[in-house]
Amino acid sequence: MDNYDLIIGSRFQNKNPFIKDGMPFMRYITNKLMSLMTNFLCGIKLTEFHTGYQIFSKNFCEKVPYKQNSNGYLFGFETILQAAFFNLKYGEISISSSYKGYRQSCGYFEGFIYILGNFKIIMLFFLAKFNFYKHKLFK
């Protein structure tokens, strides 16, 4: 993973976390569908977009206006689209996650708001990519 600007920890690379790690079924389905949609719409080939497990290079931190990103769950999604927009090198590594015991996650309403936020970021990505409007995330 040398010379990557963004490394993403993916629960979906080389395995099914619904079976292996006990990921809740609705989270699994939603995550897979949203990731497939983002792959299709944005042309970014990753197995997962909805992870907080990320490593940033110095180059990423210097070129990407990540301080303009949201302060919640959308941060990770925004950084992936920013890396693609700024033509930075990104890749994935396989990780595992435990869904037993205490864990922090969003509820159904927060999840719905998160999905709407994803669509908003995708729209801003396209507007910037085609030079219609450059939101602060893509300047």
Model-derived segments and spans:
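Catalytic donor-sugar/metal-binding loop of nucleotide-sugar-dependent glycosyltransferases
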Residues: 44-45, 67-71, 80-98
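Terminal low-complexity segments of carbohydrate-biosynthetic enzymes
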Residues: 59-60, 116-139
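DNA-recognition element of transcription regulators
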Residues: 77
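Short, hydrophobic secondary-structure boundary micro-motifs
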Residues: 48-49, 92, 134-135
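Acceptor/aglycone-binding surface of glycosyltransferases and processive sugar-polymer synthases
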Residues: 1-73, 100-109, 113-119
